[in-house]
Amino acid sequence: MTTKRKPYVRPMTSTWWKKLPFYRFYMLREGTAVPAVWFSIELIFGLFALKHGAESWMGFVGFLQNPVVVILNLITLAAALLHTKTWFELAPKAANIIVKDEKMGPEPIIKGLWVVTAVVTVVILYVALFW
């Protein structure tokens, strides 16, 4: 059975998401995947350079010292920190932790995640620099 009624289709521009700050921030957060891809490719390139000997590794280190690569890596670091911050803020919403018959607030969980991140970072830096 068909109908002759024409359904109402609300006009939607391609930039609809730019009007609300929530959606702009959502797109920014989802966009942090692009720098993560850059870092993944760079890391794989470095592993292959390490596999192929000292000369290849020195070429990779020279590549990393390029100012454009340094800027891209700083952008990647900022994107990773933004993604980490938003992820840590979402984590308490997924966990329902009850302490003394009261639901725990998100602050201790967020602070705990940042402490774990800082400790793991310090341990990795210590192993990389002094071991």
Curated annotation (Swiss-Prot):
Taxonomic superkingdom: Bacteria
GO molecular function: succinate dehydrogenase activity
TM annotation in the entry: 30-50, 57-77, 109-129
GO cellular component: fumarate reductase complex; plasma membrane
Topology relative to the membrane: Multi-pass membrane protein
Record's subcellular location: Cell inner membrane
Purpose of the protein: Two distinct, membrane-bound, FAD-containing enzymes are responsible for the catalysis of fumarate and succinate interconversion; fumarate reductase is used in anaerobic growth, and succinate dehydrogenase is used in aerobic growth. Anchors the catalytic components of the fumarate reductase complex to the cell inner membrane, binds quinones.
Keywords in alphabetical order: Cell inner membrane, Cell membrane, Membrane, Transmembrane, Transmembrane helix
Family annotation (Gene3D superfamilies): Fumarate reductase/succinate dehydrogenase, transmembrane subunit (1.20.1300.10)
Protein name in UniProt: Fumarate reductase subunit C
Family: Belongs to the FrdC family.
Assembly and oligomerization: Part of an enzyme complex containing four subunits: a flavoprotein (FrdA), an iron-sulfur protein (FrdB), and two hydrophobic anchor proteins (FrdC and FrdD).
Signal sequence segment: none
Entry-linked InterPro entries: Fumarate_red_C (IPR003510), SQR/QFR_C/D (IPR034804)
Organism, as annotated: Salmonella typhimurium (strain LT2 / SGSC1412 / ATCC 700720)
UniProt-listed Pfam families: Fumarate_red_C
KW Cell membrane (keyword) present: yes
